[in-house]
Amino acid sequence: MAKKDAYKLTYNTSDTLFATNLGDILAPSFASIKQTRNLLGFSSGVDSTALFFLLLECEIPFDIAIVHYHTRLQADDEVAYAKELAATYNKLCFVAHAPHFNANFESNARSFRFDFFQSLIIKHHYTHLLLAHQLNDRLEWLLMQLTKGAGLGNLLGFADERYNYDKSLNNYTIVRPLESIPKNELYRFCKERGIKYFEDSSNQDKTFRRNYFRYEFCDKLVNEFSAGIARSLSYLQRDRQSLENMLYADTLELESLKMQILRQIHNISVPMHTHKICCIIFSIHKSKVQDDENLLLLFCDKVAKQCGYVLSAAQRDEISKSRFNCKIAHFIITSNTHRIYIAQDSMSMYKIVTQSPMSKKFKIFCASHRVPSKLRFLLWAEFCAWEMLCKSAYADADYLVNEQGNQHLFTHFLAKIDNFFTL
């Protein structure tokens, strides 16, 4: 008898009833991924293992990916179990081995993990990333952000849409089917079926802030009030989505500058990391939000998160005090009379140096079109990079080396950015 059949025979009447109840709860989430290419972020813990078997029950297509951090002896067994499950149920299993992180382990591990998932999504054309975050996880995040001082934009974590800033790459959707399911229900699900899973011993260490919140507050609250907490988080999510839908950004992509950066970074694997290089200026018209400072701050939150960064309470205060005219981390935040602009300072991040100083004509153009001074060096760098690419592509064309050709080149570039700063 195949192992898959043996798994199905572990059901009894109460198991089947419980599976039906949990399946009913998850049906809306699963309906959207029946015909898609799905990658499951797997850890061999109770959450992702329960999701693995729930996906099997509902005949959802998926493969799995796991990261080996080499921080615990048990991790070898966890990776081996992932491979065993994949082989048993005819799934692909991808494994990444993380380097040693000297500091900020959680942040660096998360970044490495998502880079790994991203590379697989690009290479194998997955459209959805399935994550096993459950209700307790969501409450942990909310309470930790609440104690730091956070607005609606950051209380609920990252959005479910991941945008790649490389046009050649596809965007993908993150699905969290278990987000309204209490963790104790997942323990029950696995226990009643005799499903093996692993417990990460580091989760017991209360010196980690997340673990402290988990054991002192979150688990107790979810065990007592899970239904109400799930509803509240759902309402907050809808409220945030409605607000963020109002905050649609106009964008100006600095494509030539990005190409120059990519040429300079020879030691970075293109499919794994270029999605992080954001050479885009984001903008919103103040009248769109009635010049409401809170909504403009929410816009800043939204753009920062699209770039993989969470603004702190202190940073939000600094943006407000500066009247949206400051630099936060690698973000340039500036404005003119009509608009707010946000861009990553890619020149500083990647040590880009322009070969020629700003021309007088370019300075006049910027002044007449109300281009904020903090953005002018980015636009000039884009022009210099674009000019270099054009001259390289048309090296034999005479018009590019005479005054008339250069004038045509410059006029074409200005036309590209004209409407962005005047409308």
Swiss-Prot record:
It catalyses: cytidine(34) in tRNA(Ile2) + L-lysine + ATP = lysidine(34) in tRNA(Ile2) + AMP + diphosphate + H(+). Its EC number is 6.3.4.19. One of its GO terms (molecular function) is ATP binding. CDD domains: TilS_N. Gene3D superfamilies: HUPs. Keywords: ATP-binding, Cytoplasm, Ligase, Nucleotide-binding, tRNA processing. It comes from the Bacteria. Pfam families: ATP_bind_3 (PF01171). GO terms for cellular component: cytoplasm. ATP binds at S43, S44, G45, V46, D47, S48. It is found in: Cytoplasm. One of its GO terms (biological process) is tRNA modification. Ligates lysine onto the cytidine present at position 34 of the AUA codon-specific tRNA(Ile) that contains the anticodon CAU, in an ATP-dependent manner. Cytidine is converted to lysidine, thus changing the amino acid specificity of the tRNA from methionine to isoleucine. The N-terminal region contains the highly conserved SGGXDS motif, predicted to be a P-loop motif involved in ATP binding. Belongs to the tRNA(Ile)-lysidine synthase family. This is tRNA(Ile)-lysidine synthase. It comes from Helicobacter hepaticus (strain ATCC 51449 / 3B1). The lineage of its organism: Bacteria, Pseudomonadati, Campylobacterota, Epsilonproteobacteria, Campylobacterales. The gene is tilS.
